[in-house]
Amino acid sequence: MNDVKLEVEDLSVRFATRDGMVDAVRNVSFTLGREKLAIVGESGSGKSTVGRSLLKLHPASARIDARVLRFGDTDLLKAGEKEMRAIRGARMSMIMQDPKYSLNPVMRVGDQIAEALLVHRRLPRAEAKERVIEMLEAVHIRDPRRVYDSYPHEISGGMGQRVMIAMMLIPEPEIVIADEPTSALDVSVRLQVLAVLDELITARGLGLIFISHDLNLVRMFCDRVMVMYAGRVVETIAAADLDNARHPYTRGLLAALPDMDHRRPVLPVLKRDPLWLTSQEPR
């Protein structure tokens, strides 16, 4: 893989609780270049925790450790809050799951996107507005000037997620982390939004971490798939080779996918092996 932007080796995340420290992520390793990497697994497997760790978005109760956690020339483990503020949004951005919880309901859409740009760059307001209009056009919004002046409740869910994509990409980051960005959308709208995201990521040569539980989605959208179970990576495989997955957990997830062409009287139940909690993905 060319142009490695992000290097993660033995990332572990623990949270302090009343009952002691809880391991949420254990010894996760991967690299990311100009590609689309999916992180998949069931709820609670540690997918989002990995994504948030890269931006240091965890609460003070979290402890992040790693042998290597490097973004370009920056050691993220040693980076202070001032340095991280310069990275968040400008060089590495995160698209959240549901725009109705991410967008400010009392602030016009265009002003919110412009704010994401102006916090990192000094531009005249008029120039920033034109940049926002261009970005709304880039995410295939047909009437960008109307949407610019709209409030979040005046646009649809699919359009809201396009607005979030525009907001996260307008500062021209190097890496985008998309945390279940289409799970709140209808299937038809989901594919449209993913097509927009794919087009922009590819055209700009960005790295993408796509967090999802939908194996069918990542199979057609991503280059590589990293499968997590109970905070560990159990398998990393090319998306095109998912049907040849070797780990029983990955195969179990694939077997549980509904198949519209073949009726099954009973959906398979994934049988878990305690050894999965101790084994590590081969390096």
Residue ranges and their predicted role:
Residues 2-5, 14-27, 33, 57-62, ...:
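A short, flexible loop at the N-terminus of ABC-type nucleotide-binding domains that lies
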Residues 4, 21, 142-146, 236-283:
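Short catalytic/signature loops enriched in Gly
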Residues 75, 127-146, 254-255:
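Conserved ABC ATPase "signature" region
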Residues 76-93, 111, 119, 241-245:
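ABC ATPase NBD coupling module
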Residues 170-174:
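A short, proline-enriched helix->beta-strand linker immediately N-terminal to the Walker B motif
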Residues 218-220:
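A short, surface-exposed alpha-helical micro-motif characterized by mixed small hydrophobic
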